[in-house]
Amino acid sequence: MDETVYLYKGEVFYFKDSPLKFDESYSYYPDGALVVCRGKIIEAGAYENIKERYPEAFVTDYSGKLLMPGLIDSHIHYPQSEMIGMYGKQLLDWLNEYTYPTEEAFGDSEYAGRVARFFVNELFRNGTTACMAYATVHKESVNALFSVASEYNMQMLTGKVLMNRNAPQSLMDTEESGEADS
């Protein structure tokens, strides 16, 4: 695994406790730094206090930009990665025209794996380090997502979606098939 140390300079803001505790709940460094190694944040704080400890770090300067590490998405659908922004007049139109046809492909392990890798990389690229993600009715989709998340040591809750009505037959489960595949 890559042992390069990355130092990101900018305005660093993160929560360390419940936001209900107001002033005690966060840390803010107007001239801050995040230090990352092997995909993990190993230190955050004032740039002046950190920079000398990492002389070999690859530095990216985001001065004037807000850096917020460790976002958590508590409701996201990984199978919808390829249809972000698709228009639908109503939810049912959108499900029938885009969602269901897209989700039918997730029975293919190779396809599910490609989308899972894209999905996890997009989460990280946007600062999300943990999530609760919906998969599809296909066990292959769940296995692919767990596999990629594990490879990156990402904290994730996910599981097989169970559908037994209001969807195409190819996406439906019975109680027995849902239990067998879970």
Q: What is the meaning of each model-derived region?
A:
Residues 140-182:
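Metal-coordinating catalytic core of metallo-dependent amide/deamination hydrolases
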Residues 90-141:
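Divalent metal-binding segments
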Residues 5, 58, 129-130, 155-157:
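Structural motif
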